[in-house]
C-alpha cells in the first residue's frame, strides 16, 4: 500500500545505473538473497534462511506499510534486481541482496534519493526503527546521509533525520 494520498512512482532514478522499481508482486528472484545467513542475521538478528512463505509475508507487510521497491542495477544495458527497500516516514528497511553489489555505496545512494523523496512529499522527519548494534555498515550508510542516532533499542539503535534542516545555504543570496 502506497503512502496514503500519494501515488507511488513506477520507477525512481537513483543514478545513471541504479533505479528503484515499484513492487509488482513478483519476488521469486529475491528468494536467493534471503538464503544468505549473514544477510538474514543483519536484517533479522538470527541466521534462519527464509522459506517462500516467510518471504511472501515479509513483502506483504512491507507493501502494506509503505512504498516497496526493488533496487535495480543496469548490467549489459538491462536492469536487474539487486535488493529491496521500503520507504515510509516511520522506517526505511533496505537490503542489498546480491552480494557482489554490497560495499559499493549503492545503499547510500538509495537512502539519499529517498531522503530527497521525503522532502518532495513535505515530510518533516524520517525515522529508522532499528539498526542492530553489530550492523556497522548500515549504521554508517544512514549516518553518512545525515541520519542521527536517536535512541538505544532492544538490539541496537533507532535513527532519524530532520528534513526541515538543510546543510549549508542552498539558495542564492539576496543582494538587497
Feature locations, PLM:
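Conserved beta-strand-loop-alpha-helix junction that forms the acyl-donor binding cleft
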Residues: 128-139
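Conserved acetyl-CoA-binding loop-helix of GNAT-fold acetyltransferases
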Residues: 103-117, 139-144
Amino acid at each position: 500500500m502506497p503512502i496514503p494520498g500519494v501515488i507511488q512512482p513506477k520507477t525512481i532514478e537513483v543514478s545513471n545505473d541504479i533505479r528503484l522499481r515499484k513492487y509488482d508482486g513478483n519476488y521469486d528472484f529475491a528468494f536467493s538473497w534471503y538464503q544468505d545467513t549473514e544477510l538474514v542475521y543483519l536484517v533479522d538478528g538470527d541466521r534462519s534462511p527464509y522459506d517462500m512463505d516467510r518471504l511472501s509475508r515479509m513483502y506483504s507487510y512491507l507493501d502494506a506499510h509503505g512504498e516497496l521497491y526493488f533496487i535495480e542495477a543496469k548490467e549489459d544495458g538491462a536492469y536487474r534486481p539487486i535488493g529491496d527497500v521500503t520507504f515510509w516516514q516511520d522506517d526505511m528497511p533496505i537490503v542489498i541482496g546480491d552480494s557482489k553489489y554490497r560495499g559499493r555505496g549503492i545503499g547510500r545512494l538509495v537512502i539519499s534519493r529517498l531522503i530527497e523523496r521525503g522532502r518532495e512529499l513535505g515530510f518533516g522527519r524520517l525515522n529508522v526503527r532499528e539498526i542492530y548494534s553489530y550492523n556497522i555498515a548500515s549504521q554508517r550508510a544512514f549516518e553518512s546521509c545525515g541520519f542521527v542516532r536517536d535512541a538505544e533499542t532492544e538490539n541496537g539503535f533507532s535513527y532519524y533525520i530532520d528534513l526541515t534542516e538543510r546543510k549549508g545555504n542552498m539558495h542564492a543570496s539576496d543582494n538587497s
